[in-house]
Regions:
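N-terminal Rossmann-like FAD-binding beta1-loop-alpha1 element of flavoenzymes
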Residues: 31-56
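Helical element adjacent to the flavin cofactor pocket in flavoenzyme catalytic cores
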Residues: 171-230
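Glycine-rich FAD pyrophosphate-binding loop
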Residues: 49-69
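Active-site substrate-recognition segment that forms the wall
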Residues: 106, 114-122, 208, 226-267, ...
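Flavin (FAD/FMN) cofactor-binding and adjacent substrate-gating region
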Residues: 2-12, 80-86, 110-190
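C-terminal catalytic lobe of FAD-dependent flavoproteins
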Residues: 281, 305-307, 312-317, 321-428
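Extreme N-terminal leader/targeting segments of oxidoreductases
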Residues: 1-31
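Glycine-rich active-site loop/strand segments that organize a redox cofactor
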Residues: 69-100
Length: 539
C-alpha cells in the first residue's frame, strides 16, 4: 500500500516536478502571496495576467495540503446550505454569492483543459444522494436551485438512483449535469505552471518569519531574504504559522483521508454505473470511479491528524457496507489533507486592513470557492472590483482552539450517528411497506381465485376500523304461473295494543248469530207443577 499525507507530490507525476527554488535575495514586487495553494496560485495567475509583478512564498512545496485537491469535484455552492444563507443575509445577497460560486466553477473548467494541463482527466456530472426518503424536500430544493438560482439540476427518484448505484442505502438524488471532476494533484501544479508562464515567481521551502503590514510598502521577512510589496495576500489557510497565529486560530482544522482500491474489473461496473462523483447529504460518503475500474473513496471528516494508513480498513469496510456485491476490496493507496473550516461555514475573503488581504476557510467546496476568491482579490487590487464585500457579514471568529476541536469531533460523531440511525429507520420503513404491498397482492390474488370480494384495507394504527355496510334487502321472488294454490304468506306477529282489548258494539246480524250459537236452558218449574206433570205422564 502506498501511503502519503497530502497526495500532491506522490504518485506517477512526482518525478515530473521541477527542482524547488528558494528565495535567497531581497525582492520588491507589487503583490506578495503567502501560500502556494489553490487560492494563492489563482491570485498569482490572475494578477500576472493583468500585468502585476507577483511573488509567491510557500513554506514547503506547491500544493502542500491544498484544500479541495482530494476527489476533485467542482460544483457551485458553499459549505453553508442555501436556506441558512438566505436566513442570514437575505435572498438578493445569497443570489449574488451563488453567482460568484458559479463563476468560480466556470473558471476552473476554463483552465482544466488538456492544452493547459495535460492529463487533467476531466469527467462530467455530480450526484448528491440522500440517506432517507426526502421526496417533499427534494421538490422544494429543485425549485429553488432551478428557478431562483438558475442552476441546471435534475431530480432523481429512488428507482433512478438505485439503477445507477446498486445499493439500498440511498433514496432520492439531485443530479448536477454541469458539475465535473478533475485530478486535483495535476490541477494545482498546472496552476503553478500557468502562473510562471505569465511571469509570477514562486519560491518554495521559504517560510515567512514575520510580516509588517504598516505603511504603503509592506515588509515580509523570510529566513534568508526580505521582500517588500504594496499588497500582501494571506492564502496559507491553517498553516500561516507563528507570525499570523491569531488569524490561523479563526479556522478549525479538519482532516479528511481517502483511499483508492486496487483494480476491481467488471464487478465495479455492475455495482456502480454512475461515472461522476457521488456524495451524500450528510457528508459521510464521497466517492467516484477513476482509471476505469478503481474506486476512490473519502473517509468522514475528523478534527485530529493521523496517518492515512489507519483509515484504510475503515474505508474498505464502508465500501463493502454500501456495495455488498463488491465483497472485500483491497485499498492500494491512501492519502489525506487538512482544510480550514470556519465557525459560520463561509470562506474568509476580504481586506483586513489597507493592502492586507485574506483568502482562506474554504471547507468542503475548495476548488470553486478558492478560484472565486483568487479572482475577486486580484480584480479588487488591480481593477477596484468591490464584490468581495458580499463576504463582509462573515467575520473572523475564534474557532475555540483545542476545545473547539474536541467539540467539532463530538459534533461529527453525533452527526454521523444520527445519520446512521435515520438511514436505518428509513430502510426499515421501506421494507415494511414492501412487505405490506406483497401481503395485499397475495390476498387480492387469493380473493380473485376464490371469487370473493376484495379484502378491506386495514386502517393505519390508531384509527378505528370502518363500519361494515349491510347489503340491500332483496325483493321476494315472483310467483310462478303454474302454481295453482299458492301457499298463504305467513303473517308477522304483532304485539296487541290496549285498543284491541276494548269491547266493540255488535251489529244486529252478529248479535243474532251469537244468540243462536248459545244454549237456552228451560225455565225452572215449581214443585207442585212438576209433580202433576209426572202424574199426567204416568196416567
Amino acid at each position: 500500500m502506498i501511503e502519503t499525507f497530502t497526495g500532491t507530490t506522490e504518485g506517477p507525476d512526482a518525478a515530473a516536478l521541477r527542482e524547488r527554488a528558494r528565495l535567497s535575495f531581497d525582492l520588491d514586487v507589487d503583490i506578495c502571496i503567502v501560500g502556494a495553494g489553490l487560492a494563492g496560485l489563482t491570485v498569482a495567475l490572475e494578477a500576472s495576467r493583468m500585468g502585476a509583478s507577483v511573488a509567491v512564498l510557500e513554506g514547503r512545496h506547491v500544493g502542500w495540503n491544498a484544500s479541495g485537491h482530494q476527489l476533485g469535484t467542482v460544483m457551485p455552492g458553499f459549505g453553508l446550505p442555501v436556506g441558512e444563507l438566505i436566513e442570514r443575509i437575505g435572498f438578493e445577497d445569497t443570489k449574488a454569492l451563488w453567482d460568484l460560486s458559479k463563476e468560480g466553477a466556470a473558471y476552473v473548467r476554463a483552465n482544466a483543459t488538456e492544452e493547459n494541463i495535460p492529463g487533467i482527466a476531466l469527467s462530467e456530472g455530480a450526484l448528491e444522494v440522500s440517506n432517507v426518503d426526502v421526496g417533499d424536500q427534494l421538490i422544494s430544493r429543485l425549485q429553488m436551485l432551478a428557478g431562483d438560482f438558475e442552476t441546471e439540476v435534475e431530480g432523481w427518484q429512488i428507482d433512478r438512483v438505485r439503477s445507477e448505484l446498486k445499493t439500498d442505502r440511498y433514496f432520492h438524488g439531485v443530479y448536477f449535469p454541469r458539475a465535473f471532476q478533475i485530478d486535483g494533484r495535476k490541477y494545482v501544479h498546472g496552476l503553478a505552471a500557468m502562473a510562471r508562464r505569465c511571469g509570477a515567481r514562486i519560491f518554495e521551502d521559504t517560510p515567512v518569519v514575520s510580516i509588517d503590514p504598516s505603511g504603503i510598502r509592506k515588509r515580509i521577512v523570510t529566513p534568508s531574504a526580505r521582500l517588500r510589496a504594496s499588497h500582501i495576500v494571506l492564502a496559507g489557510n491553517i498553516h500561516l504559522g507563528a507570525p499570523l497565529r491569531r488569524l490561523s486560530e479563526t479556522l478549525l482544522p479538519v482532516w479528511r483521508y481517502a483511499g483508492v482500491t486496487a483494480p476491481l474489473g467488471e464487478q465495479l461496473a455492475e455495482a456502480v454505473g454512475f461515472r461522476g462523483s457521488v456524495t451524500d447529504t450528510d457528508g459521510i460518503d464521497h466517492f467516484r470511479i477513476i482509471e476505469g475500474d478503481r474506486l476512490m473513496w473519502a473517509s468522514p471528516e475528523t478534527t485530529w491528524a493521523a496517518r492515512p494508513q489507519r483509515f484504510a480498513g475503515a474505508i474498505a469496510r464502508r465500501i463493502r457496507t454500501i456495495f455488498p456485491k463488491l465483497g472485500p476490496v483491497e485499498i492500494s493507496d491512501t492519502f489525506g489533507g487538512a482544510i480550514g473550516q470556519t465557525v459560520h461555514g463561509m470562506p474568509q475573503i476580504g481586506q483586513l486592513r489597507k493592502g492586507l488581504w485574506v483568502a482562506s476557510g474554504f471547507g468542503r467546496q475548495g476548488l470553486n470557492t478558492s478560484a472565486m476568491a483568487g479572482q475577486l482579490i486580484a480584480r479588487s487590487i488591480l481593477w477596484g472590483d468591490e464584490r468581495w464585500r458580499l463576504f463582509s457579514p462573515f467575520e473572523l471568529v475564534w474557532a475555540g482552539g483545542a476545545t473547539g476541536r474536541v467539540a467539532g469531533y463530538v459534533v461529527g460523531l453525533w452527526g454521523r450517528g444520527s445519520a446512521a440511525a435515520a438511514g436505518a429507520l428509513a430502510r426499515h420503513r421501506e421494507r415494511a411497506q414492501i412487505q405490506e404491498r406483497v401481503r395485499e397482492a397475495r390476498l387480492a390474488e387469493a380473493n380473485r381465485q376464490a371469487g370473493t370480494r376484495p379484502a378491506v384495507r386495514r386502517p393505519p394504527p390508531g384509527q378505528p376500523p370502518p363500519r361494515p355496510v349491510r347489503p340491500p334487502r332483496q325483493p321476494p321472488p315472483a310467483k310462478q304461473a303454474s302454481q295453482a294454490y299458492p301457499e298463504p304468506m305467513p303473517q308477522a306477529y304483532q304485539e296487541p295494543t290496549p285498543h284491541d282489548y276494548q269491547e266493540q258494539p255488535l251489529t244486529r246480524q252478529e248479535a243474532t248469530q251469537a244468540d243462536q250459537a248459545q244454549p237456552h236452558p228451560e225455565p225452572p218449574v215449581p214443585a207442585g207443577h212438576r209433580e202433576g206433570e209426572e202424574a199426567w205422564r204416568q196416567g
